[in-house]
Amino acid sequence: MQRVLNKIISKDTINTMGKVAISKKVEKLRTFMKDQSLSAYIVPSEDAHQSEYICVKDKRREYISGFSGSAGCVVITLDNQLLWTDGRYWLQAEKELESNWKIMKDRVVGEPTIQDWLLSNLNKENKVGIDSRLISKGYYDSMKLVLKEKSIDIKFDEDGENLIDKVRESFKDEEEIPEYPKNSIFFLEDKFTGKQSNEKLKEIREEMKKQSADLMVVSALDEIAWLLNLRGSDISFNPVFLSYVVVEHEKVTLFVDESKLNDKTKSQLPSGIAISPYSSVFEYLRNSDKQGKKIWIDPRSSVALYNCVSISNLLEKINPILLSKAIKNETEIQGMKNAHIRDAVALIQFLAWMEEEIVEKSDETSHTEYSVCEKLEGFRRQQTDFVSLSFDTISSINANGAIIHYKPDETTSATIVKGMYLVDSGAQYLDGTTDVTRTLHYGKPTQHEIDCYTRVLRGHVGLSLLKFPNRVNGRDIDCVARTHLWSVGLDYAHGTGHGVGSFLNVHEGPQGISYRAIANPTNLQAGMTLTNEPGYYESGNFGIRIENVMIVAPVTTQFNNGKFIGFDNITLVPYERKLINLEMLTKDEINFINDYYKEIGEKILPLIEKTNNQKSINWLKNQIKPL
């Protein structure tokens, strides 16, 4: 299995932008658009499984625009080229896009959505092109509803031929066309999953019976991996594999490149499973439709899947896997806790090393934002059951910290100097996924920096302390983390928390904590894992973010109402002492931090002491002294 895991560790190595100029690619795309009488062409970020993180071959939006953020959608007309992205990426987009591109602020009140902009800027009966594999049924329906006002038609790519792929093919002599990965798939043992795949399938089939469904189509990659207790490495940082699954009452069909499955993995598959070629899922659904079978498809799935099924045979409904996966069982919860303990050991060793290198040896050493990432990864690799990072490490000094999802480049990243340093990182372990952010200061912080950090910390602590009814969803409590920033007119342009998978995707739904309307709003429930990550970003100066992973858990209250829940912090890394203004904290906030430091002392300090690294031991002891 180690050979498989090493493939997950490796990052995408193909330069998706290549040698061909962006303007030349856009020009070629417009030629193809004219051939098909298209007035606009939409290039989403997602792949055929609506994944946030995708393999190199599916990075079509980055290929045609040069924007490398994980979220965003491009619209190209015959005269305009626009990128919609959210507040995490506005500064990054300004840096990466050429000057003739327009950045549109996604999910901001008062700013036009893609469909609103198309309605205002296209003429009646114009045609908009998109690949039906890359747009979800839910989003397609909402777009179609808006555009029908002008009878604007959404036209799907002819014969499934994506126009960006055609552009790539046109320049194949000038730059390499990436291939889909063929990495091996492996079985994840019961000691990590806590539930066998056959048990999960039994529960799914019971739900299918309730809905009178003959088939259920599963297209989300993390849901497939969870359901079958399999993991892969087709997408960097995400232990998933390109596939579809169709669940029936007597069998399961896994649509996948069979070469990825060795004999041992095949022998570990659940009973009654058949293997079919990856792309044959569409024909399989068409044949099932002809037989009059009731087919359950999740509205988050692609239009291409829906187009295989007649309306009379369709059941359009969120599948039960989404929620089942989000609510961790006892084995997964313990695994997440164990993974975070080992991850804390790695991060604390790194932070102690940084303090020594940047502060104590500042005249002797020189480190960049990129080079220190490699040092941090090295500490994580030493931990038991480490598989890979869970996303590209965000390592940013001073002004770069204001770029919320800043990614340091090997050749252009800044030298680490004294000032505000933000590091957002995480790892994949066989027993859990981690995501943690700490903001440090190497030097003497200003009073303004201390004030801003303390306000972010108070929001972070306030959310950690919150007790609330189990009928509450994440949107209801998002403001708790913002209140101390709002009181002085400050805010941050991202959600406060996202779900985290168990050795799966670092971003997991449906749970989340955000002021925005959540696509699949669901009440927070015991067993869910979420991040708590308020921040503040001052363009040109610094960025602050503090992030822990928390598990939703039952809590006791004064009146012992068993229907209340709260959060259990499982990230165990100290905050930055020199950035905390004690006079701004309440007694409850100080008590929380001191209790947190006591827990770190009990669970992490003994493990740091076992490393025999006196610098790390001294650093941690100093950091967790009571406030």
From Swiss-Prot:
Positions bound to Mn(2+) 1: 424, 435, 547
List of residues binding Mn(2+) 2: 435, 498, 533, 547
Pfam families on file: Creatinase_N, Creatinase_N_2, Peptidase_M24, Peptidase_M24_C
Enzyme type, top EC level: hydrolase
Subunit text: Homodimer.
UniProt function note: Metalloaminopeptidase that catalyzes the removal of a penultimate prolyl residue from the N-termini of peptides, such as Arg-Pro-Pro.
Name of the protein: Xaa-Pro aminopeptidase 1
Organism, scientific name: Dictyostelium discoideum (Social amoeba)
